[in-house]
């Protein structure tokens, strides 16, 4: 349970009042493919510290036993990163998982996360991600082989099943057979993707019946939603968030337009160097703006101009206008 607020622990920001509490809970930043790369993680931590662990874009090991250049870049030595990161593995082959886990250990990581929750059609069609939930006997064999030889701690991220939340009790029986460091549950089924309501009754079942520590993930997009969840589930010690933190990078710490602008500009400059030009750098930044624009009131007109521009100077001008003329909303409009 969050302790009582001490005197002076409310931070006033532009049109926001954000509580700053003693962080007894653990807050994780979920991976978002194409957004939360090593540059984003490093820059976010510099401007908005307080995240317990950042989860990396998943590695997909193959029989070739070789990391791609992108994967190597995303997996630097753990002691070279000034915050905690967790590599995420996406595979249905135990031997490939164990090889990749050893690569992570060799680089100094103390945990890897098995992703059996990704609902992407291209992933599921290969029997990976949430596709592994379709055959519990095969999943059991996979986990048995992995935990018999894993060189470091293994956590798991899962959904409730493929099509029906009633699949989850049998799935949890499988997970309960293994010493999973932490079971992150996104209480939707695969066919929902990210639409529709989450099944909180199934998450309650998990809380009551899991033999392993449990982390919650799903539909925590604003500080109000986080506070409401923690009030209903005070015993949950870890929460993973994704789109909400992309949309409001300072959701946990509080922020103002000046800090957001500095964060944005630092990201942009890094991407201009890495991508070697403005086109791809602006494309990456526009992906961030897809969520972050919802933090500003009356952003429709400037947002339309932002999406259309292909000129870096014009892009910079529009962004400056957003930060200097549009007020921050009291809370992110999570209407995606």
Where are these regions (language model features)?
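Alpha/beta catalytic cores of nucleotide-metabolism and tRNA/nucleoside-modifying enzymes
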Residues: 13-23, 27-28, 33, 38-39, ...
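Glycine-rich, positively charged N-terminal anion/phosphate-binding segment
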Residues: 14-21, 32-103
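Hydrophobic faces of well-ordered beta-strands that scaffold small-molecule active sites
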Residues: 27-30, 54-56, 85-89, 112, ...
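Active-site beta-loop-alpha junctions enriched in small/polar residues
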Residues: 32-34, 59-61, 90-92, 117-119, ...
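Alpha/beta enzyme core
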Residues: 101-112, 116-121, 126, 137-212
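Short glycine-enriched, charge-decorated loop/helix-capping segments at active-site entrances
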Residues: 127-133, 255
């Amino acid at each position: 349970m969050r302790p009582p607020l001490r005197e002076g622990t409310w931070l006033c920001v532009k049109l926001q009042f954000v509580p700053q509490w003693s962080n007894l809970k653990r807050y994780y930043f979920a991976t978002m493919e194409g957004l939360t790369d090593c540059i984003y993680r490093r820059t976010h931590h510099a401007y908005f510290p307080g995240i317990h662990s950042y989860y990396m874009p998943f590695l997909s090991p193959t029989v070739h036993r070789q990391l791609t250049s992108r994967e190597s870049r995303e997996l630097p030595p753990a002691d070279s990163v000034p915050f905690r990161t967790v590599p995420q593995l996406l595979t249905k082959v135990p031997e490939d998982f164990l090889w990749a886990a050893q690569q992570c250990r060799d680089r100094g990581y103390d945990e890897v996360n098995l992703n059996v929750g990704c609902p992407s059609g291209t992933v599921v069609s290969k029997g990976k991600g949430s596709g592994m939930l379709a055959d519990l006997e095969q999943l059991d064999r996979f986990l048995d082989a992995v935990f018999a030889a894993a060189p470091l701690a293994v956590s798991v991220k899962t959904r409730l099943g493929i099509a029906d939340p009633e699949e989850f009790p049998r799935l949890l029986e499988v997970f309960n057979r293994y010493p999973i460091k932490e079971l992150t549950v996104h209480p939707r089924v695969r066919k929902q993707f990210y639409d529709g309501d989450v099944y909180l009754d199934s998450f309650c079942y998990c809380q009551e019946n899991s033999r392993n520590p449990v982390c919650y993930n799903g539909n925590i997009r604003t500080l109000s939603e986080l506070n409401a969840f923690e009030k209903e589930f005070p015993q949950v010690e870890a929460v993973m968030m994704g789109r909400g933190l992309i949309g409001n990078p300072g959701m946990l710490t509080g922020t103002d337009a000046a800090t957001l602008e500095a964060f944005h500009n630092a990201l942009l400059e890094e991407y201009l160097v890495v991508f070697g030009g403005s086109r791809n750098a602006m494309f990456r930044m526009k992906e961030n703006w897809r969520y972050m624009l919802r933090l500003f009131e009356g952003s429709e007109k400037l947002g339309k101009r932002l999406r259309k521009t292909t000129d870096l100077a014009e892009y910079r001008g529009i962004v400056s206008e957003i930060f200097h003329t549009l007020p921050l909303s009291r809370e992110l409009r999570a209407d995606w």
